[in-house]
A protein has these predicted regions:
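A short, structured surface patch at a secondary-structure boundary
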Residues: 104-169
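Glycine-centered flexibility sites
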Residues: 46, 66-67, 77-80, 99, ...
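N-terminal hydrophobic signal-anchor/signal peptide
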Residues: 1-48, 154-158, 178, 182-194
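Acidic side chains
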Residues: 39, 64-65, 96, 107, ...
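A hydrophobic, helix-centered structural microdomain
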Residues: 3-7, 22-95, 130
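Short, hydrophobic secondary-structure boundary micro-motifs
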Residues: 57, 100, 139-141, 146-147, ...
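Short, glycine-rich, amphipathic interfacial segments at transmembrane boundaries or analogous
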Residues: 4-15, 71-109, 170-194
């Protein structure tokens, strides 16, 4: 089912929509411990079998510019709790201080290795560590930076009731946001609830 169809079924009245989402969450409450168990097993297994890939990516980043392997950024997690998301670094050091908050087009801050990591989404693999620590889930609403969460309306805030995910339906649909910028997929978190 398309994202548009999913949202077309939401009531126009935000209070009714919030009540519907709360009912869905209550109904799925028993599933959450099983989902967490699956996250632990899958992320631990993924980290184990992907160790050679992690080492290769780390070596490539070090050989490219000698900087740190990981990039950490503060994101908003479940129940609004901030956490430090991990990614393999794809930009020059201190890039967040030297440009736009979004990467667009041929951003000169992206390293050569970083271009490959972004194109293949290998930079996201480090988030398996966030999943294992319980800060994220494999599937859920994408974790946003605080400045976007501050703009959420009450319905959008419902997504914060879930553990953020490494992937979600919007991440698949808007896979390459650097070519075609769309507003942050704020409402995508609600799709994860459904």
């Amino acid at each position: 089912m398309s994202i548009k169809k999913k949202f077309s079924s939401l009531p126009a009245d935000q209070d009714a929509a919030i009540a519907e989402v709360e009912a869905i969450l209550r109904h799925k409450r028993w599933q959450m411990p099983f989902k967490r168990g699956l996250d632990i097993v899958a992320s631990a297994f993924g980290l184990l079998i992907l160790t050679p890939v992690f080492l290769g990516v780390a070596l490539a980043i070090k050989l490219d510019d000698g900087g740190p392997v990981f990039y950490r950024q503060l994101r908003v997690g479940r129940n609004g709790k901030p956490f430090s998301i991990l990614k393999f670094r794809t930009m020059v050091q201190n890039a967040d201080r030297a440009g736009l908050p979004l990467t667009v087009g041929a951003d000169p801050r992206v390293t050569k290795v970083g271009q490959l990591l972004r194109r293949t989404k290998l930079d996201e693999l480090a988030q398996l560590m966030n999943v294992l620590r319980g800060e994220m889930s494999l599937v859920g609403p994408r974790p946003e930076v605080l400045r976007y969460v501050d703009m959420y309306d009450p319905l959008q805030r419902m997504a914060l009731r879930l553990r953020p995910g490494v992937t979600d339906p919007a991440s698949i649909r808007y896979r390459d946001e650097t070519r075609c910028w769309v507003p942050p997929p704020i409402r995508s978190g609600l799709i994860s609830i459904r």
